[in-house]
Curated annotation (Swiss-Prot):
Keyword annotations from UniProtKB, A to Z: ATP-binding, Hydrolase, Nucleotide-binding
Top EC class for this record: hydrolase
Subunit text: Forms a complex composed of PxpA, PxpB and PxpC.
Role summary: Catalyzes the cleavage of 5-oxoproline to form L-glutamate coupled to the hydrolysis of ATP to ADP and inorganic phosphate.
SS bond partners: none
UniProt protein name: 5-oxoprolinase subunit A
Primary gene name: pxpA
Enzyme Commission (EC) number: 3.5.2.9
GO biological process: carbohydrate metabolic process
SUPFAM superfamilies: Glycoside hydrolase/deacetylase
InterPro entries: Glyco_hydro/deAcase_b/a-brl, LamB/YcsF/PxpA-like
Pfam families assigned: LamB_YcsF
Protein family membership: Belongs to the LamB/PxpA family.
Native source organism of the sequence: Mycobacterium avium (strain 104)
MF annotations from Gene Ontology: 5-oxoprolinase (ATP-hydrolyzing) activity; ATP binding
Length: 252
């Protein structure tokens, strides 16, 4: 069976405050979505994560977001397109320098949180993010949701789009993620999540919260590093995929 990428959000601590177990997750995933300082992450912590990723052969991606430290990037911001474009260029550039100093490089871009969800349907912001990536490096793939306006804008600019699925998030019937504010939005049982991911990879489909079967394009699977039991969930997913003969490998 073909391989699949496993990605996780890392580098999201700040100062003395730590979120998740970055070191443990880097021993499991093939790609690390590293924060760029706008929703989380400080320079020393980001350098540490990039160094560890380089040592383990884990690919580094720039996890760009709204300028929202207090809200962890999970709040929609009605920012002008030109300002958002500049913010994304800045974030990619900052992480490129840190990754280079760590002996690695940024090989893809993934929007974070509210920005990720917004550009599924918001044409102006989707275009701004896609254009920012193109301006920095048109060879950088973008990781996101298949069928999104963001993917349309990225493809229009010649960017490679990489579709991802979420291991531990519930899906709505329209294919979008259930809001974290709603009960059952974040899944927690490692064994059940692992079986769900294997089914996604093997069948190209997932069951929404109302029982609807949704077609799902999957090149990468996100296992959130900040979820309760994240390491156990990621380990279960990796082990189940490997047991089924699915190779864990990066897409870039």
């Amino acid at each position: 069976m073909a391989g699949i990428d496993l990605n996780a959000d890392l580098g999201e601590g700040f100062g003395v405050w730590r979120l998740g177990d970055d070191d443990a997750m880097l021993g499991i995933v093939s790609s690390a979505n590293v924060a760029c300082g706008f929703h989380a992450g400080d320079p020393a912590g980001l350098l540490r994560v990039c160094r560890s990723a380089a040592e383990r052969g884990v690919r580094v991606g720039a996890q760009v977001s709204y300028r929202d430290l207090a809200g962890f990037g999970r709040r929609f911001i009605d920012v002008a397109a030109d300002e958002l474009l500049a913010d994304v260029v800045y974030q990619i550039g900052a992480l490129q320098a840190i990754a280079h100093a760590a002996g690695s490089s940024v090989c893809y871009v993934k929007p974070h949180g509210a920005l990720y969800n917004t550009i599924v349907t918001h044409p102006a912001q989707a275009a701004a993010v896609a254009e920012a990536v193109r301006l920095v490096d048109p060879g950088l793939p973008v990781l996101g949701m298949a069928g999104s306006v963001f993917f349309d804008e990225a493809a229009r600019r010649g960017l490679r789009v990489v579709a991802e699925a979420f291991a531990d998030r519930a899906y709505r019937p329209d294919g979008r993620l259930v809001s974290r504010r709603e009960p059952g939005a974040v899944l927690a049982d490692p064994a059940a999540i692992a079986e769900r991911v294997l089914a996604m990879v093997e069948t190209g489909a997932v069951t929404a919260v109302d029982g609807t079967r949704l077609a799902l394009s999957v090149e990468s699977v996100c296992v959130h590093g900040d979820s309760p039991g994240a390491v156990q969930i990621a380990t279960a997913v990796r082990d189940r995929l490997r047991a089924a003969g699915v190779e864990i490998r990066a897409f870039c």
